[in-house]
From Swiss-Prot:
It comes from Bos taurus. Residues 290-315 bind DNA. This is Nuclear transcription factor Y subunit alpha. PANTHER family: TRANSCRIPTION FACTOR NF-Y ALPHA-RELATED (PTHR12632). Gene3D superfamilies: 6.10.250.2430. The modification Phosphoserine is found at residue 320. One of its GO terms (biological process) is positive regulation of DNA-templated transcription. Residues 305-322 have a biased composition (Basic and acidic residues). Keywords: Activator, Biological rhythms, DNA-binding, Nucleus, Phosphoprotein, Transcription, Transcription regulation. InterPro entries: CCAAT-binding_factor_CS, NFYA. The keyword DNA-binding applies. Heterotrimeric transcription factor composed of three components, NF-YA, NF-YB and NF-YC. NF-YB and NF-YC must interact and dimerize for NF-YA association and DNA binding. Interacts with SP1; the interaction is inhibited by glycosylation of SP1. Interacts (via N-terminus) with ZHX2 (via homeobox domain). Interacts with ZFX3. Interacts with ZHX1.
Length: 341
């Protein structure tokens, strides 16, 4: 398991993942982090050396692989791992434009680590569902708002969230590049006034706060490629965030609004459908319907005058003065005025 910690001037971010892909959503842009720990290089001193690939701008892409660290200026920077306490491995990366260093800590599976007031607990063996718990017992004040204790439990290795209210989307990837699971939950921590728990790994995810309970359902499948919708929770008028469902490409669109009929019409429609299906199976009628039966009748119907809703006028209604065309009535009135004058 790997841990990515980015220290800035105002606050610290901590991301705990296993080899896969993490997408972190921020206010100004999107930060995508991809970790691959299979390729490692051993230095002359016997320490493990791992490199990063950084592309500046928005979105900011960080890729950990067996290559090298490429900054916005195009200059490669080698990052060397330093062994820490309790069998941990710490890598420090200089960041241009900010004060401080970015630290990447490698934690063996099944080990508990406590650092900077945050506890990271990893449970489960290989091939089983693992649980990652991120806790922040201390109180933080951001933009004049007091943020209380926040606890996040992630099951299924899919969704996580930082203490600043930023969302992390973890998508496991197969060897062939297909995504196993997909989903996203965005919950601004500043908009909630109490402890917050997000659990992922089942069909139903419950988010509880001090003001109420919001239930979110995420499509989660084991080894099946998921093409369902994406659920986003955005702050509403109150303290409880609202839920919006955005269909992803490939999701089935809803059918048109059904036509309402009475019981007699419904049974008659069923009988006609059964009779037509029987004739189509016997080959007596074609399966594709024509636009019209006779072309002459179609032209005649299109030439007839229609009323509101496309209804045809009856002969009596057509001859009545209040059913005439308004333009035609105005022309007749003008003709009478000219004759009188």
């Amino acid at each position: 398991m790997e841990q990515y910690a980015a220290n800035s001037n105002s606050s610290a971010e901590q991301i705990v993942v296993q080899a896969g892909q993490i997408q972190q959503q921020q206010q100004g842009g999107v930060t995508a982090v991809q970790l691959q720990t299979e390729a490692q290089v051993a230095s002359a001193s016997g320490q493990q050396v791992q490199t990063l690939q950084v592309v500046q701008g928005q979105p900011l892409m960080v890729q950990v692989s067996g290559g090298q660290l490429i900054t916005s200026t195009g200059q490669p920077i080698m990052v060397q791992a330093v062994p820490g306490g309790q069998g941990q491995t710490i890598m420090q990366v200089p960041v241009s434009g900010t004060q401080g260093l970015q630290q990447i800590q490698l934690v063996p599976p099944g080990q508990i680590q406590i650092q900077g007031g945050q506890a990271v607990q990893v449970q489960g063996q290989q091939g089983q569902t693992q649980q990652i718990i991120i806790q922040q017992p201390q109180t933080a004040v951001t933009a004049g708002q007091t943020q209380t204790q926040q606890q996040i439990a992630v099951q299924g290795q899919q969704v996580a969230q930082t203490a600043e209210g930023q969302t992390i989307v973890y998508q496991p990837v197969n060897a062939d590049g297909t995504i196993l699971q997909q989903g996203m939950i965005t919950i601004p921590a500043a908009s909630l006034a109490g402890a917050q728990i997000v659990q992922t790994g089942a069909n139903t995810n419950t988010t509880s706060s001090g003001q109420g309970t919001v239930t979110v359902t995420l499509p989660v499948a084991g080894n099946v490629v998921n093409s369902g919708g994406m659920v986003m929770m955005v702050p509403g008028a109150g303290s409880v965030p609202a839920i919006q469902r955005i269909p992803l490409p490939g999701a089935e669109m809803l059918e048109e609004e059904p036509l309402y009929v009475n019981a007699k019409q419904y049974h008659r429609i069923l009988k006609r459908r059964q009779a037509r299906a029987k004739l189509e199976a016997e080959g007596k009628i074609p399966k594709e319907r024509r636009k019209y039966l006779h072309e002459s009748r179609h032209r005649h119907a299109m030439a007839r005058k229609r009323g509101e809703g496309g209804r045809f006028f009856s002969p009596k209604e057509k001859d009545s003065p209040h059913m005439q065309d308004p333009n035609q009535a105005d022309e007749e009135a003008m003709t009478q005025i000219i004759r009188v004058s």
